[in-house]
């Protein structure tokens, strides 16, 4: 990630992805969102405990639809249901800059392959790939925009 990058973690839970990014990429700003107030509280407490000042923790509706991100890293909330998950991903991947990318860890048995197919259809100007598979999980990547063919 380039210095100054804006990174988004959707469904941050207690903050493992957001806080790891903030620790290893101190020149970046990480926005961690979750609908669960308790999860947000724990993420804030963990960020404070770690002395991180480059993390913002918020509810999704607290983030402007005009906000743009350079990267989205997430273990997305698969269990909320397919239609709700699709709405969440449509919004947040749609808020990536044209050069922005997304990386999502999804359980193979939770529909990683069908999600990759859906992402490719939903975002035809962005390449979608199964970057890596291990121990029942897939890392799905959504690349920067390219011209439509």
Question: What do the predicted segments below correspond to?
Answer:
Residues 78-79, 107-112:
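Short "lid" loop at the C-terminus of a central beta-strand within the Rossmann-like core
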Residues 99-107:
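Conserved beta-strand signature within the Rossmann-like core of class I S-adenosyl-L-methionine
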Residues 23, 45-48, 86-89, 117-120:
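Short, glycine/charged-enriched secondary-structure capping and boundary segments
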Residues 111-149:
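Class I S-adenosyl-L-methionine
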């Amino acid at each position: 990630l380039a210095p100054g990058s804006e990174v988004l973690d959707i469904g941050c839970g207690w903050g493992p992805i957001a806080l790891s990014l903030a620790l290893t990429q101190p020149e970046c700003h990480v926005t961690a969102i979750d609908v669960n107030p308790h999860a947000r509280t724990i993420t804030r407490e963990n960020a404070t405990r770690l002395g991180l000042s480059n993390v913002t923790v918020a509810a999704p509706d607290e983030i402007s639809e005009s906000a743009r991100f350079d990267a989205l890293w997430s273990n997305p909330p698969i269990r909320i249901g397919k239609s709700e998950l699709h709405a969440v991903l449509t919004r947040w991947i749609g808020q990536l800059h044209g050069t922005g990318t997304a990386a999502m860890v999804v359980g193979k048995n939770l529909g990683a392959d069908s999600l990759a197919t859906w992402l490719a259809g939903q975002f035809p100007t962005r390449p979608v790939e199964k970057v890596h598979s291990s121990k029942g999980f897939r890392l799905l990547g959504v690349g920067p925009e390219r011209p439509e063919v």
